[in-house]
Amino acid sequence: KFGVLSFNGNKMITTSGGGALICADTESKNKVMWYATQAREAYPYYQHEEVGYNYRMSNICAGIGRGQMTIANEHINHHKHVQALYEELLADVDGITVHKAPSADYDSNYWLCTIELDSTLRIKGQENAYKEVIKTAVGGAAGVIHAVDTAVTDCQPNDNVEALRVYLLNAKIEARPVWKPMHKQPVYKNAPAYINGVSEDVFKEGMC
């Protein structure tokens, strides 16, 4: 019934944050906007009979997004070019798979280039993976991180993935593991999860 677009800072079109909800009809849109603008009742003062939120995008952020939409095709073409470079450069490297569209029937914008490393692939420095605790945010991520006592968790990328990340970091090339499965996040350890092992495998072998 709804479509969701992300305009986060790392996306093809960004408003510095936030996104958009695509609604099928006016009734749904009005209901969503009611919740997104604090769910106020029709009184000359603030009256709330349901919990509302302040989720509406500011006009400044929306203006940034509208401006970027005029050059969306340029962004897409650039990302496709970057993807083509990775496919060319890694084509002859045994043990590395570049994720790409399965056929010409698909037209990916390649907002994110990802690879998968076979667990048997050896990377220089692999023996030192996870020996040092991370001190700063990884892969261009902003914000403050919470200090930890160990570099190891019960679900983490394979040693060769971490070794390649560190190697690229030292070469000033931004890279990071793919997203950790939600059911493996400690904060959700007691939440129900329906899994088959695929997400864990992708996390252990993937890099973007």
Predicted segment positions?
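Short acidic donor-binding loop at the edge of a beta-strand
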Residues: 2, 17, 31
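PLP-dependent aminotransferase class I/II
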Residues: 26-208
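Glycine-rich phosphate-binding loop of ATP-grasp-fold ATP-dependent ligases
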Residues: 12-20
